[in-house]
């Protein structure tokens, strides 16, 4: 193992200029969800250039590269090709698609979320070919579509491959991550009876029912996890079926962003909201005659390959125990490679790791870059962390293969 790591470390240092160049090319190529085709082509070409044994693009547009190993456990490296919008370009210190390097950091949209980590993973898998070391089992590098809007790409991957373990490469400041809260998006709809605003007694105003529900929402008893913290629910968007200001709407809807801990399933969330609706609407005379419903939102997404899927707005939560053998092996490997013990942490946001765990694939998290900068106009990734990450990803492949035996 030590000999393997020394060889991998030496090869990773040689690769560093190429990793940076590759990341800059990825960052300079915009790839919003559903428009990842150009970046997918760049990634596919890079994998072929690096000598991957197999490279292909699946029906939804994910790019998969395989490094063939022995008969041991297969390990998946997972990262997404899409990114969020830049927002106002004038708010960026440097052009968001320039990939400009300033003071040892590479700037730009998706530099850390997550084209930099994807580049590091692609080169980490290639290290085994570079030094002629056959991994214990196959390495599957999966660069996926549409993580930012649905997780469609990884859900498809999880249904196609039976890897024995996975690394979700989202940024983590090169600290091992073992889980996160999930996300469930709900729409609560209140239906009344429309009328002219000058004769409100002829209608049933759904605004009052929505107000009663929102007033009661903070009283919900939300579960607490000693590691992940409490579940949270946040009202975000509010819409009506009217555009005229002198008409009582017949229907209003509000969106709830629910961040759930593993002990709280989507079905439990729906039941809680229904109970609260019944209680809050029964308490006020102004809400009589109003009907309320709650559902998990869904949306149809179309990939750049033309495949359309209707998916619910659910990102599963997960949490591996610190005593889990995958966490233990990964932590030991990182301490050995980095020469320091940064401990084990969690993410504060949802990732595709939840979809992998739901599919039964044990998943750890690790990636270069400060995740607090994701989705901001300060997004950038330290080159030093990228150099560390290449060797760390390779070491984690070996560690997870050992844990999966």
List where the protein language model places each region:
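Beta-strand secondary-structure signal
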Residues: 64, 78, 140-142, 185-189, ...
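Hydrophobic/aromatic beta-strand patches that form the interior of the parallel beta-sheet core
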Residues: 75-77, 142, 165-167, 295, ...
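Acidic-glycine-rich active-site phosphate/pyrophosphate-binding loop
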Residues: 86-101, 178-189, 332-333
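N-terminal helical capping/dimerization or prosegment-like subdomains
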Residues: 2-87, 251-255, 269
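Metal-dependent amide/peptide-bond hydrolase catalytic core
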Residues: 2-3, 189-405
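Active-site metal-coordination/substrate-binding segment of hydrolases
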Residues: 73-143
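Fold-level recognition of mixed alpha/beta catalytic cores in primary-metabolism enzymes, strongest
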Residues: 116-219, 225, 377-391
